[in-house]
Amino acid sequence: MQDGTLLAAVDLGSNSFRLEIGRYEHGHIQRVEYLKETVRQGGGLDEERNLSQAAMQRGWDCLARFAERLADFAPRQVRAVATQTLREAKNRDVFLERGNAILGHAIEVVSGPEEARLIYQGVSHLLPQSDERRLVVDIGGRSTELILGRQYQAHEVASFRVGSVTWSKQFFADGQLTAAAFRQAETAAQAMLDEALAVYRPERWERAYGSSGTVGAVAEILAACGHESGVIYRQGLDWLLQQLLRAGHTSRVELSGLKDDRRPVIGGGLSVLRALFDLLQIDRLHVAQGALRQGALYDLIDRSSPGTDKRSATVAGLAQRFAVDGAQAERVARAAGTLFAQATPQAGDDAARELGWAAQLHEIGQRSAHSGYHRHGAYLLQNSDIAG
């Protein structure tokens, strides 16, 4: 990738949509522009898990504004990712069809583990080089991601369906902030996160980091109110809980550092964060600067070179996992590559690389059935938790 190349990441979160534009310089990304809009799409899911028309319209309106900034960007310069709300939404295809057209770039609904991997990429690239074993926590609107990693490599990734929007809607729907509601919310969060303890127990990491969303919001409040900046301690969470209980209602919370868009979801977010502190025995949580969107930007850099493209390793792993006939795949790749070069000589290396992956995986569905194997293969690929 050439120095000076502009890259963009669009993060369609459950609470906010974000656009980050950066310039590639000597292996690093310098921020050029950052936009954030509170869309609260996660709050627009009904009991049948369908997005309301109003929630979709808020999202489309935001994407239209982002599209103005991305008009001159080529597809290889942009990665747009959607997370838990669109993973859940039964009518997501309705939103995506129009959203893709408005944005001018394909929106990818990433799996929970892929979201966690990208979060770790974003966090690790903005931390000093270190060999420490890291725990990374990201509490979003409808999901919480946990990652164990070292340097730039994530070793364990997991995503749980508990977040600030869902917990606020479930336990603080009327805005009332009571001790009983917090007890119920924390107990429910621990029940959802309990299985994480086997993998993310304290002896497996040396330092804990929190990124984006709730962690950033809580850290800003604590710092603005005189607590140590850049780190969250349990006593800080206890102090914040008392302030919320004293206020009694979200509309009456008066705290420096609390932004208006965080006010309706601060109860749910704090209860999940407190549950994690208890469950994983966290005594201090360092606030990371990177998050999902930075991870998507650095992933674009990796994708620009065949040697670092995570998707190549993923394809090789899938071919081995499903016992694809390697010799046959290679013959298909050569034949398809020859025809492709003759038919579209102007096509670039990216398209040829994707065709090669398709050749490696085109018979993957035969592990399920010979009849209609291409449809089985498509289903397996679409529903596998795979990196990249």
Predicted features and spans:
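A generic beta-sheet turn/junction motif
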Residues: L12-S14, I139-G141, R150
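Helical "lid/coupling" subdomains associated with nucleotide-phosphate turnover
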Residues: Q2-L7, Y24, R40, G44-F73, ...
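Structural motif
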Residues: S16-R18, S143, V215
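Conserved beta-strand/loop subsegment of P-loop NTPase cores
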Residues: Q77-A80
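A generic, well-ordered mixed alpha/beta core segment in the N-terminal half of proteins
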Residues: R133-I147
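N-terminal glycine-rich anion-binding loops that anchor highly charged ligand groups
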Residues: H28-V39, F73
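N-terminal basic/disordered segments at the start of proteins
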Residues: Q2-Q30
